[in-house]
Each structure stands twice: as C-alpha cells, then as structure tokens.
Amino acid sequence: HPICIEIGAGKGKHALLFSAQNPQHNLIAIERTREKFLAMQKQHEIEGQTNLNPIHADALPWVVHALHPKQVQQFFILYPNPEPHNPAQRWLNMPFFEFLISRLDQHGTVTLASNIPEYIAEAEQQLINVWKLPFVKEVIPATSARTHFEVKYLERGELCQQLIISKPEGYITRF
C-alpha cells in the first residue's frame, strides 16, 4: 500500500475524509497539539478507518526517525502556520524540506495549501529558484471543506490556493 502523510492534521477532518475516500491508501496523520490530536483520535474511533494511523508527535523528528527514502507517495501540508515573524520556519524555506522530498517516491507529490497569497508566492519562488521542482498552482474551490481552517477561510470569501509539487524521476537529494 502506498503511504500518505499529513503533517499538522489538526482535528483530523481531512485525514478522516481522505482515508474514507481512498481505502487503497494508508494515511499517517501527524498532529503535535495534544488537544487536536485527541479530537482526531476520538473521531477516528467512531469512524474506524483501518487505513488511518493518527500520530501524536512533532512532525520533523518523527519524519526523520520513521520514514525511509522514497517511501511516501503523498505529503499533505494544509494551512500550515504561516510563521509571519519567522520566515526561516516556513516549510519551503527550511533545509528540512530537502529531507522531506528525499522521503517522497518518484512522481510523488506534496500538497501545500494556504489562504495567504504571499505565502504561496514565496513558496513558488523557492520551488523555482532553490528546489527546482515542478508544481501546479490551483485555486481551491469555494465548495471545498477539507479542514476546519479551510471551511472558515472560504466562508469569509478568502482566496485559498494550493501548490501540488511533484518529484520528477531522477531528482537527487543529499539524503
């Protein structure tokens, strides 16, 4: 079974939906905040998807210790903290992003969603100039409801966008 990973799964809205709709994929949903993790766990106990594995952990050390190179088919990073005062902590600005890509199988994808146009624009520049990875930018339809944040932002009429980043065949990382 292909492995998919959601980083910062929150209360698990997307994780539960994705695992129910994609029984052929195993999803590991990682959430650091105890309160949100427990909410996800509780809902998972009710719904019972056998292909969903909620994990209470900080994603960075967990990814480093738990994943092998080229093991992951899809990463989801949906509405991450935009780190307004700490640009170095944004996903595509971190050296760690290279390690994340090393865990992605050839033709695997990273889905990065945000309601902040500047965050998406900066990520695009990083993909072009630093990571040299192909991507597709999409506007998220107003009817989408993958996460609690997404619902809130779209109800407010905010522009939500995502980058679907691909790992081409033969892409080399140092890890």
Model-derived features: where do they sit?
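A short glycine-rich, Lys/Arg-flanked "PGG" loop and its adjoining helix->strand segment in the class I
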Residues: 92-106
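Short alpha-helix immediately C-terminal to the canonical SAM-binding loop
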Residues: 37-38, 120
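Class I SAM-dependent methyltransferase core
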Residues: 6
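Glycine-rich SAM-binding Motif I of class I
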Residues: 12-16
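Class I S-adenosyl-L-methionine
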Residues: 119-175
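Conserved SAM/SAH-binding beta-strand->alpha-helix loop
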Residues: 33
